[in-house]
Amino acid sequence: MPSRAAILPDAAYRNLKTATAMKSFHKELWMDVPERMGFVNITRDVEAALAESGIREGLCLVNAMHITASVFINDDEPGLHSDYKRWLEELAPHAPLSRYRHNLTGEDNGDAHHKRQIMGREVVVAVTGGQLHFGTWEQIFYGEFDGRRRKRILVKIIGE
């Protein structure tokens, strides 16, 4: 059986041989939201991490490292954030605590786990020319659903 390189066109093989090694960079951001539920625009923090990484082309993963928090992309418009809070509370109300079997363990955050599930765990954004490659109005947000304690966000950037 021929080697993989043998079945590539000459130009593709030359590009493989001259490719640079991919860089990997990570940074942790810390959040301390004083309310039970809140949204924080972290776009500038992620942009600062990207600048620090020196990576010009690649991918940027931003991940909430707690099971009652989320990272998502949307518009930074206060009415939308208010709508999200109302909608999430309608879908997974905090009270009554007895609504959630999870709370039988002594916890009081069963709703926060559901809210996180709805809003998602992480986002991945393309990096182009050393910038986050967003669509119009897109911003990165941290969503907190069981606040009042310090939590961590992972920013992982890979590329060249």
Predicted features along the sequence, with ranges:
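Active-site histidine-anchored catalytic micro-motif
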Residues: 2-160
